[in-house]
Amino acid sequence: MERQYRNHLSGYLHWDQLVHAEDWLLFEKNIGAYICIDEVALSRGELYTVLTNKEAHGGKGSMIAIIKGTDVHTVTSVLLKLSRRRRYQVREITLDMAPNMEQIARICFPAAKRVTDRFHVQKLAYEAVQEMRVKARWEALDEESTQIAYAKACGKMYHAPVFANGDTRKQLLARSIYLLYKKESLWTQSQGIRAEILFKEYPDIKKGYYLSMRLGLIYHQCKFKDIALTRLARWYDEVDKSGFLTFGRVARSIQTHYLDIINFFERRATNAAAESFNAKIKAFRAQFRGVRDRAFFLYRLAKLYA
């Protein structure tokens, strides 16, 4: 039935982009003033670069380009096929912190302001806190292993010390994973108790947690670029004083992209449209239980979103 639809009813065999469909698709008429770029795993982990028009709100006319691979040369060689007039119409492009995406945006859309997605910036800070937690957990596991070996050598049974909430040290560190991603006001009662114990035992994790939350507050509270710049400068100072290596790496990444990060405060634009479109592609793929014929899958995708 599907073969019948594919070969006779769909118009797929007469598609003007069939020859290069697996490598790239372009829909120049869909370019708008506000666009976003991201990558998606189409099938079997094969990455494609997707360019979408925000003003289409995930419906028809959303897809501008879908290109196999994320290499700068490959992607730009396709996007430069778009007319210069159209490319210079783009006023803003949102993207993540990947250097290849930044290069693609700069080469293909030179007149557009680049905006680094706020969620990718905040994610760096959250991951820095998690790195501190994981390091502490490994240390706790090593300590427990040493204590077990010592007890065994003495012919005794080892009993791990338990905190007031019933967690052992390694359980405390393992079970704190989710609360460190959340605002303090969103903790449940049990998470609040666990956080209190965690922060008492590991003051560095407490400092790291509040550093990550303060970065989020800059995005939430600041409405103007100059105020955001001042607040970010203060945040850098706090990171320097903390001496945390994990946050030092975060601060350096932010400094590298700070011009694109600060552009967020003009229109508060995020890459949510790209993430949403990627989710639609994955849902469409799941509906057909995977991708057997990649070119035909892209044809159907184009019919819906291009």
Model-identified regions with their sequence ranges:
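Short secondary-structure boundary/capping segments
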Residues: 8, 51-52, 107-113, 129-134
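Short alpha-helix plus adjacent loop in nuclease-associated cores
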Residues: 121-142
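Acidic/histidine-rich catalytic cores and adjacent linkers
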Residues: 44-46, 54-60, 76-81, 85-111, ...
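RNase H-like nuclease fold core
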Residues: 3-94, 99-104
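A short hydrophobic/aromatic micro-motif that marks alpha-helical segments and, especially, helix-coil
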Residues: 12, 53, 135, 290-291
